[in-house]
């Protein structure tokens, strides 16, 4: 059945197909059709895990980028995900980069996007979260506005942290998108030190204010040298971050050279990212030694490569591109077999 749906969606521009999917899941998720949707997907509960002090019904999650504004939470939940991460969201609404900005590479089962954090702003997302009928684990992925300088970026993260804290089960600091100018600079040296110091201090204040501790994860890029991975791991440990998500999209085209759309600027996700992200997970695991949980993301499209990421050191997994190419049945397979 999904083969027919995919054929129809792939006849549309990639972003048009995404928008149509979100609208459909929003409508079905918030209507009397929701129980029917759950029956249609028929996903088992899976194997529960406790990570970051949170109880996940299974280790398979929806990656950020699928539901930027939290509009289709119930629809995605019906697929059987153990957790859902919405965003990336910024303090103020922004249009992102000019269209077209999403490109499929069907031969490689890859996607290139240069969206640039297009979203309706943190306030809009929070309203959607407040009204969502969802009792699973919800992550909110936050970033900075494009017009905010890298030097002033910390202020944007703190604004979003303040507003998301009460409504999120965990929060992700996105400093690794390749589509916001200069953003990846925040992964290194003093910039990362300053950002995490500010975030942890605000987390402490908010925990006292709301009388609950909300874990904070950091999402990193796959395009890191050995030395950079070591440095990031050390910084995450010193600041006692609650988790790390590895990885975001890649700017490398080594695995898709010569394919149509491979020359497009932006971050590459899907199968071409599979090996690179797993290598980063394995290297991170060596450095972190289990002190900080790793959430694996990047090119998951089968039970076999999902297990590779678990073996490399990931404790939870996230996917999005694999869902586009393989449909909701992939979620069912992963939930059934990944422990």
Curated annotation (Swiss-Prot):
An example GO CC term for this entry is:
plasma membrane
Q: Which reaction does it catalyse?
A: (S)-dihydroorotate + a quinone = orotate + a quinol
Q: What is its EC number?
A: 1.3.5.2
What's the cofactor? FMN
Which keywords does the record carry? Cell membrane, Flavoprotein, FMN, Membrane, Oxidoreductase, Pyrimidine biosynthesis
Record's subunit section: Monomer.
Q: Which PANTHER family match?
A: DIHYDROOROTATE DEHYDROGENASE (QUINONE), MITOCHONDRIAL, DIHYDROOROTATE DEHYDROGENASE (QUINONE), MITOCHONDRIAL-RELATED
Tell me the HAMAP family matching this sequence.
Answer: DHO_dh_type2
Q: What is the official name of this protein in its record? A: Dihydroorotate dehydrogenase (quinone)
What organism, scientifically named, is this protein from? Pasteurella multocida (strain Pm70)
Gene name on record? pyrD
